[in-house]
Amino acid sequence: YNFSFYDNHDVLIWDLMKNKIKIDYVFNLCDEGFNNEARKELHVPALLEMLKIHYSGSGPQCLAYCYDKSLVRGIAKEMDIPVADGIYIKQEDMSFTFLPFNFPVLVKPNFGDSSFGITQKSVVKDMEELISVISELRSEFGYEYPLLIEEFLIGADISVGIIGNPPESYKVLPIIEEDYSELPKDLPKICGYEAKWLPTSPYWKIKSIPLNLPEETNNFIIESCLKLFRRLECRDYCRFDWRLDSNNNPKLLEVNPNPGWCWDGHLVKMAKLEGISYSNIIEEILKATENRIGLFQNNI
């Protein structure tokens, strides 16, 4: 492959327009959003759509769906795919005095990715802590958008990766779980902001390991991921996060159609378990894109 890197967002639109005739397709590595604004993650594929340039990965509508966690929850429930019990809290809402499910609960931003706003403090055990954490998200993190409050699940913390485009041609990568065995026992078992971005945190010791599930549970999770992949219009690759409850029942947490590209990201970890290197996983995604757009069949 011969690549040209377009990483200057100030002139990105002009560069794409100027060089459009030379571009077979774009490998979209922009997982932090246009101008590094997370809410503008969908703007890059939207721009490519308007310029009629083919690109890898999901389209703007899919990215918009999945950026809204409550919307994904609603779609999953409509499809009879279980999700954690939860409620949606609007920006101005601090008047609630009870929850329709038991503590402990997990508080997280409804919009966003990269575990922004999800820390050890996000797992709370009573109403007083809950109100305090919500206030902190509003003030210290500057998060002014709706929140989700979900039951805190204590079972295996699971990730599933798919490369390709079901139902025609796809690969389900080995399922992994987070290994919390080295985490101090007084800390909640979550893979949040500290685990991904703070090397000095005890959460940095979390590892991802292969997960062996009962066949029925394994098949249900994979089938549900494939259904969601198609329903949400994911393309070429995607990651799905699940967690088991205390009875080992799987519950969908989130769908990430544009997971991070760092060398130690979850998609890369899954691929390594199947002997797929970092460069090979990129090649497989490129091949999935080429097959989808008919690059060679139609001489595009």
Which residues does each predicted region cover?
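Active-site nucleotide/adenylate-binding loops and adjacent lid/helix of ATP-dependent enzymes
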Residues: 17-20, 63-148, 154-156, 166-167
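Short, flexible active-site recognition loops that position polar ligands and cofactors
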Residues: 267-279
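Phosphate-binding site of ATP-dependent enzymes
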Residues: 127-216, 220-223, 246-251
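Conserved N-proximal alpha/beta basic substrate-recognition cap immediately N-terminal to
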Residues: 1-85
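Peripheral (often C-terminal) accessory segments that flank ATP-dependent C-N-forming ligase machineries
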Residues: 95, 203-216, 231-237, 244-247, ...
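A short, polar/charged loop-to-alpha-helix boundary motif
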Residues: 184-185, 262-270
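Conserved metal-phosphate-binding beta-hairpin within the catalytic cores
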Residues: 151, 160-162, 229-262, 271
